[in-house]
């Protein structure tokens, strides 16, 4: 009997006993569980499943009164079904310890998309981006920024640095369900309640030429009249007094701005301006809450109830300090600091031309649009993870682990989702395949080698190898560097450099021979080390030299030692030796010549002559 069948038989026996007795004890459950299940959480999951079958698990055997409440059921089919389910759960519990299996299993639960499903998700991505654009269009300076970029294009800058396309309003795109209201209006307040659930649920193309798109977005009917009729940098008080016509013009600007598809760099610049304003606002609000709640001991609930709509009312803290509350006196001491923070909020309102509520509303609308686009992109990515697996399998054994190939392919998949244009008519998988292959091959070229080689050099090496194989088939032998250079139209020196770079490094621990006791590093010569023969020869020469010098007089031996630096740090000139002996340099030369004549005598020279041959 196989291990799995035996395991299922034991579980079936356990469940049958539980149904006959009406209960099980923890000891009985523990005796019947497989030995490899020891995690307390896994045991709790199994006991919970047994309880779901109607079998109670007790610390010890219950009394007779408790057993009367349980109905014994020994249905064989029910026991087998329960045992199979429990065995499957146990197998699943063990399987979840492997992150790769978890990834594969969760990936398999997502259904593949049809062409219509891809279009629907792509439209949701566009709709989310349109909502973001519509929200930031109401932020002061946004339209001015776009018109400034349009002027740069007219002066010769590349349009592709500003726009990536234009969403045709006449196309069958699912338009936003409602217009994006102007922040601060009643319509915006009403829509805020309707979108609360949308925001909380998120934790976190045949296109026209861009030139025509930007020209359309800067129609004279709005953009030319825009600076003169009302300023994008007016203060909040002036904006609250807008006549209805100017409000419609502002909405028209937002409507024109929404279809524009900016390049990511330009899009991020505009979004970052809104985020920066909100971060400055939040920073001051947190400082005020810290002063009130932490320092003045004001209840947090009271602060959250009283502070909204009083962000820029500099009399707010003073009025609260006059109340008869436990924290009023402490709040009065912090009044100056609170007013200073409120003054910074007033300065922010003056700088942006928006009230605090309007800044929050613009950011809320922008966050909702980003959440919609992010969710749609996530669905598109998850539905195509299997495509990455199928492509990554073709690039195994090229220097990167399979999981690394999958991760690099997923990066390419996410880029494909960002750049997919469903209006061109092809399926997403057709388009994404090239992005995934590009990401995987680039990562292999960039990371697979121990010594990194630039990607352009990798491409040259691959081309060289391909042509070398072709020439090998044509000529029946390996081509020479000269022949390769002629075929590739490259200098011979560069061909030799490429061939040298193309060599793969090997480990010094590579086994050599059948016994594998020796390694490649054992056979590599260390050029910095002296050979034993050379060291022995030098030592013998030193000993022979000392013996020969010992046959001279002490004065002659010392002169020769000083002249040639024997047993000294350096040699000496005749002048230096003469000063040592307090004689002239000529006398030292005579002593040296006499010592040389003695050394040339055959009885002494024969000891040193043998070293000349070595």
From Swiss-Prot:
Residues 459-535 are annotated as: Sigma-70 factor domain-3. Gene3D superfamilies: RNA Polymerase Primary Sigma Factor, Sigma-70 factor, region 1.1, Winged helix-like DNA-binding domain superfamily/Winged helix DNA-binding domain. SUPFAM superfamilies: Sigma2 domain of RNA polymerase sigma factors (SSF88946), Sigma3 and sigma4 domains of RNA polymerase sigma factors (SSF88659). Residues 574-593 bind DNA. Residues 548-601 are annotated as: Sigma-70 factor domain-4. Pfam families: Sigma70_ner, Sigma70_r1_1, Sigma70_r1_2, Sigma70_r2, Sigma70_r3, Sigma70_r4. GO terms for molecular function: DNA binding; sigma factor activity. Residues 215-232 have a biased composition (Polar residues). GO terms for cellular component: cytoplasm. Keywords: Cytoplasm, DNA-binding, Sigma factor, Transcription, Transcription regulation. Belongs to the sigma-70 factor family. RpoD/SigA subfamily. This is RNA polymerase sigma factor RpoD. It comes from Pseudomonas putida (Arthrobacter siderocapsulatus).
């Amino acid at each position: 009997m196989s291990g799995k069948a035996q395991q299922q038989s034991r579980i079936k026996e356990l469940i049958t006993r539980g149904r006959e007795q009406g209960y099980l004890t923890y000891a009985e459950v523990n005796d019947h569980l497989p030995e490899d299940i020891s995690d307390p959480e896994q045991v709790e999951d199994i006991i919970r499943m047994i309880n779901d079958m109607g079998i109670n698990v007790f610390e010890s055997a219950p009394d007779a009164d408790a057993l009367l409440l349980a109905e014994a059921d020994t249905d064989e089919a029910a026991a087998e079904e329960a045992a199979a389910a429990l065995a499957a759960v146990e197998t699943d519990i063990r399987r979840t310890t492997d992150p790769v299996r978890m990834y594969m299993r969760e990936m398999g639960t997502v259904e593949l998309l049809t062409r219509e499903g891809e279009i629907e998700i792509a439209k949701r991505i566009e709709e989310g981006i349109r909502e973001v654009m519509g929200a930031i269009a109401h932020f002061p300076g946004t339209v001015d920024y776009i018109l400034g970029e349009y002027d740069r294009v007219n002066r010769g800058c590349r349009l592709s640095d500003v726009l990536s396309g234009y969403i045709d309003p006449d196309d069958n795109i699912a338009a936003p369900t409602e217009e994006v209201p102007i922040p601060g209006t009643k319509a915006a307040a009403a829509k805020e309640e309707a979108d609360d659930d949308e925001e909380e649920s998120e934790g976190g193309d045949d296109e026209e030429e861009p030139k025509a798109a930007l020209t359309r977005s800067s129609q004279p009917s709005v953009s030319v009249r825009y600076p003169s009729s009302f300023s994008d940098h007016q203060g909040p008080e002036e904006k609250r007094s807008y006549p209805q016509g100017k409000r419609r013009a502002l909405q028209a600007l937002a409507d024109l701005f929404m279809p524009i598809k900016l390049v990511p760099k330009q899009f991020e610049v505009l979004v970052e301006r809104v985020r920066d304003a909100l971060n400055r606002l939040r920073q001051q609000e947190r400082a005020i809450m810290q002063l009130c709640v932490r320092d003045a001991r004001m209840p947090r609930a009271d602060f959250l109830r009283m502070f909204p709509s009083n962000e820029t009312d500099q009399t707010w803290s003073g009025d609260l300090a006059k109340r008869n509350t436990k924290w009023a006196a402490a709040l009065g001491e912090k009044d100056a600091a609170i007013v200073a923070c409120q003054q910074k909020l007033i300065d922010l309102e003056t700088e942006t031309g928006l009230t605090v509520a309007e800044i929050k509303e613009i950011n809320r609308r922008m966050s909702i649009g980003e959440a919609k686009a992010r969710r749609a992109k996530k669905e598109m990515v998850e539905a195509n993870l299997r495509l990455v697996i199928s492509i990554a399998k073709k690039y195994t054994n090229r220097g990167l682990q399979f999981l690394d190939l999958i991760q690099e392919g997923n990066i390419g998949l996410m880029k494909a989702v960002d750049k997919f244009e469903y209006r061109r008519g092809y399926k997403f998988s057709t388009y994404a395949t090239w992005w995934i292959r590009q990401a995987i091959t680039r990562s292999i070229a960039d990371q697979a080698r121990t010594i990194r080689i630039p990607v352009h050099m990798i491409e040259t090496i691959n081309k060289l190898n391909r042509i070398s194989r072709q020439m090998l088939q044509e000529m029946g032998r390996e081509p020479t560097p000269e022949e390769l250079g002629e075929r590739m139209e490259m200098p011979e020196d560069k061909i030799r450099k490429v061939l040298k770079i193309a060599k793969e490094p090997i480990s010094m621990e590579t086994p050599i021979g059948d016994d594998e006791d020796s390694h490649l590093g054992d056979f590599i010569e260390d050029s910095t080390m002296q050979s034993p023969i050379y060291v022995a020869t030098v030592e013998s020469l030193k000993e022979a030299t000392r013996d020969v010098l010992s046959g001279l007089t002490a004065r002659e031996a010392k002169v020769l030692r000083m002249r040639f630096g024997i047993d000294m740090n350096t040699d000496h000139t005749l002048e230096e030796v003469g000063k040592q002996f307090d004689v002239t340099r000529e006398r030292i030369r005579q002593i040296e010549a006499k010592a040389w004549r003695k050394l040339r005598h055959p009885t002494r020279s024969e000891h040193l002559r043998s070293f000349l041959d070595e």
